[in-house]
Amino acid sequence: KYYGNGVSCNKKGCSVDWGKAIGIIGNNSAANLATGGAAGWSK
């Protein structure tokens, strides 16, 4: 199963595509800072 944030899981466990994960985390952090927390991370 792919979770859309660079993390995919199968019967063996989960793995992270750090290139995608870091890009998404960076984008969310920037959006969070710019809006005071209104955008970026889903709560």
From Swiss-Prot:
GO terms for cellular component: extracellular region. The keyword Coiled coil does not apply. Disulfide bonds join 9-14. Gene3D superfamilies: 1.20.5.130. Thermostable. Retains 100% of its maximal activity after heating at 100 degrees Celsius for 15 minutes, but only 50% of activity after heating 1 hour at this same temperature. Stable from pH 1 to 10. InterPro entries: Bacteriocin_IIa, Bacteriocin_IIa_CS, Bacteriocin_IIa_dom_sf. Pfam families: Bacteriocin_II. Belongs to the bacteriocin class IIA/YGNGV family. This bacteriocin inhibits the growth of several Gram-positive bacteria, especially pathogenic L.monocytogenes and C.botulinum but has no effect on the growth of a number of yeasts and Gram-negative bacteria. This is Bacteriocin mundticin.
